[in-house]
Amino acid sequence: MASVALKSFVGLRQQASTEKPHYFFTSQSQTKPPGKLKFQVLASKSSPRLTNRKLRVAVIGGGPAGGAAAETLAKGGIETYLIERKMDNCKPCGGAIPLCMVGEFDLPLDIIDRRVTKMKMISPSNVAVDIGQTLKPHEYIGMVRREVLDAYLRERAKTNGAEVINGLFLKMDVPKDGVSPYVLHYNGFNGKVGGVGEKRTLEVDAVIGADGANSRVAKAIDAGDYDYAIAFQERIKIPDDKMAYYEDLAEMYVGDDVSPDFYGWVFPKCDHVAVGTGTVTHKGDIKKFQLATRKRAKDKILGGKIIRVEAHPIPEHPRPRRLLGRVALVGDAAGYVTKCSGEGIYFAAKSGRMCAEAIVEGSENGKRMVDERDLRKYLEKWDKTYWPTYKVLDVLQKVFYRSNPAREAFVEMCADEYVQKMTFDSYLYKTVAPGNPLQDLKLAVNTIGSLVRANALKKEMDKLSV
């Protein structure tokens, strides 16, 4: 969340996609879909028309990507199955969602624990900069618990016709032609606690892999490996007077003590705070970095009690392969987590929905078989819309997270109100209006100046350490 601030100073002008979905809603408004909305696709296809049945699609994984995909498929007339291993899963996720996600995915306000309107970016030398000064009165960053958000999206998919299966996906048999079914093997639990479950199979026409960084669907299509970060998070119940401080405030800490290539965070939840960090390059030291994050925030969380400890891998870039035949990857399984900020919830849900829309469109609301060309439309649209964001944040991480002096420069630039305005336009709405050319030029000069000072400081520090 924090490092998206730098999108603006490298000239990134991410525009909202101008492509219109190839469907129309049969009732109510497209801008705010109700829970049981149905839509139809206008298309023509040469692929086989299905006889006496609908297209069958399985979504593996019930997080934001899987829930959004299953709901969209079910609304579009697809026979939809969603397989999720752990219905109460709690991921070590900061839980920040942009304002646009609340409206775009019609999320009820009661699943949002906190509306963050104040943010602090804290440098290695503990210089704190307020980075939410340009937020308008109605604007905020939502803080959610993943177990609450995920369960809500799965339930909404079920309400719209998806069959939600409590099961552990094991493997799939891949057909040799373009029309035979994929045979999925899984252990079904039927709400049982413990045990290995009952071995079952399911035949489907297409598969969406939304099963996270350790995706078995990705392995089944030989999607390749990627670098990943380890995220470590502790949920800490703190005294009421301390919790009042974090009521609408989030903190991000940068420094090689909390992470050599990421940041530490303190994010407010319903009645506790989430304190965490992550790293790609020094995974074995993650507990040391977590301890340092707690130490940096110690006065503000004093008297707190750890109520839950969570750890999970987070992808650092998209997989080499995200599609094969009638199988596509979305969310963390595809590698859709941004560098610097670690943002993934919105992009997971968005990719799940976009992939499902491509299937609904290609199948004419479940009436025809789909093929790889249909699913590839999702990838083409995704890459066109979001690829620049990932590339820019990759560069920014390499520039500003490489040393403590560079991190000091980063925090210094976050104090600029123009940076903050462009940041939150981009983060909250996933679109940025054209900037002010004079302000852009001034910002570029200030950025260069900050980096020059950072490099000079690093050289002096290196001399002292010899």
Where are these regions (language model features)?
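FAD-binding beta-loop-beta segment adjacent to the flavin cofactor pocket
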Residues: 312-335, 339, 387-392, 398-408, ...
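A conserved beta-strand/loop capping segment in the N-terminal third of enzymes
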Residues: 96-162, 166-167, 172-187
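C-terminal helical "tail/cap" subdomain of flavin- and related membrane-associated enzymes
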Residues: 26-30, 360-466
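N-terminal chloroplast transit peptides
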Residues: 1-38
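Predominantly flavin-linked oxidoreductase catalytic cores and closely associated redox partners
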Residues: 51-52, 76, 155-306, 315-321, ...
